[in-house]
Amino acid sequence: MPKRLGFFTRLLDQGSAQTRYRLAAEQIRHAERLGFDSAWIAQHHFHEQEGGLPSPLVFLAHVAAQTDRIRLGTAIITLPMENPLRVAEDAAVLDLLTDGRLEVGFGSGGTPTSFLPFGLTSEQRGAAFADHLHLIHSAWRGDTLSHPDNRLYPPAPQLAERIWIATFSAEGAIRAGQAGHGLMLSRTQPRPPGEPRLPLDAIQNPIIDAYLSALPDGVAPRILASR
């Protein structure tokens, strides 16, 4: 499995939102110049201390105009909080603007109170995530959307092969593997109760094993780990 080096930011620099966005764009330009393969950004709604970038695809469109080679990814879009068709449309447009450099990472987690303004509770996020991901898949495949005349434009079947799923569990890794998606692992992985110093590899290697065992024959594994 080839290894690649990526750059990840939660946009936690001190300063205003405008300053944070400017600095993150500069960092990604530097990453491209230094030979990094990819750059990934986090999404957070409402909470400045978490990073304060609610619109990652808008930001990546800005960065795409300033870069040529580096792949640009979301790590993650908190999918339960989003309109899935708008995500599908915006990602389809952005992939064209980037000449196919977009990678799309999805997750279901987030600050529990952030779900409330979107009409959800944290407990409902798993079901909402599954429903939204299914609709995005359907749209990118070119399926009709509630009426024979409605199909996603621009079409984006290629993006289905660049979906990444963030998870802390073997169960989530199995679902990602069965679907042929990439697996995203985080340095923020929770430790089991009573084992606060357990190293990440002790927790995440079994998750990786579960993912690999679930991949369909002929599907190459894609594993991303932030450190």
Where are the regions that the model predicts?
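Active-site beta-loop-alpha junctions enriched in small/polar residues
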Residues: 10-12, 44, 77-79, 107-111, ...
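Acidic-and-aromatic substrate-binding clefts and catalytic sites of carbohydrate-active enzymes
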Residues: 47-55, 80-85, 190-192
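N-terminal beta1-alpha1-beta2 module of alpha/beta enzyme domains
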Residues: 1-66, 70-71, 161
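Acidic (Asp/Glu)-rich catalytic clusters
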Residues: 32-33, 60-69, 91-102, 177-180, ...
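Internal, glycine-rich beta/alpha segment that forms the wall or movable "lid"
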Residues: 1-3, 83-189, 195-198, 202-209
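Glycine-rich, Lys/Arg-enriched anion-binding loops that position phosphate/diphosphate groups
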Residues: 189, 203-226
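Electropositive, surface-exposed helix/loop patches at the edges of structured domains
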Residues: 76-86, 141, 217-227
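Hydrophobic faces of well-ordered beta-strands that scaffold small-molecule active sites
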Residues: 5-9, 39-41, 72-74, 102-106, ...
